[in-house]
Amino acid sequence: MTLLGQDRFEDAARIALGDGVDAALVLAFHSAGGLTRFASSQIHQNTWRETVAISVMAVVDGNRVGVAAGSSLEPDAVRSTLQAAKAIAAVTPANPDFPGLAGPASYPAANLWDDATAETTPAERADGVARALEEFPSNIDAAGYIETTANEVFIAGSTGLRAYATSTQAGCSVMAIAQNSSGFAESVERKLGALDVPVLAERAVKKAELGRDPADVEPGAYTVILEPAATSTLLQFLAFLGFGGKAFLEGRSFMTGKIGEKIMEQKITIVDDPIASDALGLPFDFEGTPSSRVVLIDKGVAKDVVWDRTTAKKAGRESTGHGLPPPNTMGPLPLNLRMEPGDQSLEQLVASTDRGLLVTRFHYSNVVSEKETVLTGMTRDGTFAIEDGKLARGVKNLRFTQNAVEALSNVEGVGDTTETSTELFFGGSRAPAIKVRDFKFSSATTH
């Protein structure tokens, strides 16, 4: 991808921050990337997309705010976007909670860019697919994708705020599909070269082979080993349900009234850290506030939630750098959650379990009860019975209906390695495998 560069965004900002408003904020993106899909053990699609987006927030009469979006940085298009934002602001009721715009700031250093990933060709992604296919026997089909993306983000405010960052990302997902079983593995990194595609393929194939002819299993409460992808599903839903300042202030969060109290097992520490070396975040949020590391759960104790400028003003706090793009009705969200690893390997977690289930990942997950953090969803791509400390056989998929906070209160072991998942939200979560007692499955399937 050829970068537009900060100067190109500055040209657009000079127009968007024009006269006729009390204050203005410009948020612009440039993203480009390639995707190589494969199914039935062959490549069936190569795509390339490149997008430009710009959002202009106009403020009139002190606290009447309008936001308009466009898809071009050309001068006439930017002027049109500004005029639309001004027109919206003119008919929008005053917002007494508007905190004003962020001012200039310095941002933490972050190494987010990799030239080789930004310049990846379809042939290079195809080579990765070929290396994955080498791990597949003839009686198991391969499916999945390899994707590489490069991004620019720019923020400018009439306060003098300027923020600019470039980043790359590479992801690989591999499914192994047998006659009546399947396996799955994935990896997301900053650099394409950090993806070990053959290892992912090998993991997926082993799951499909072990899962052949899955046995029936009764619903009920089980000791489960959740692999990192399944753990991440719980984390990402908790981000949405209660780790944000708006839900906290409105009393919808499981953290409301619990700060300083033990609400999870002591083995559980959860932080949001956008600028960790293995995270996928940015050094600033979409309001231009510097990103910061926030400890949410510390050894089972509720410590804090994340804040943007609006919720921080209401709470008498400082923004933690977790604002979303305007217009934002959700409030702040932690988009780079991580559960700190423990001291047991996945093999040790399994070996310590007399009877239970191992879950590779969940899908079709959703919220049953927001305040109680009850979730439901299905197991997928590798659910196995554990007997006498060993994986005994594949079992048919199950529906879980489980209080997520309760599950993290019942953790008996935490894996010593973490993996990144990007299933639900922009950003991602990094989590280990966990061993949970009394995890509730409400129904079984026939496959």
Task: Name what the model sees in each region.
Residues 1-447:
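N-terminal small-residue-enriched
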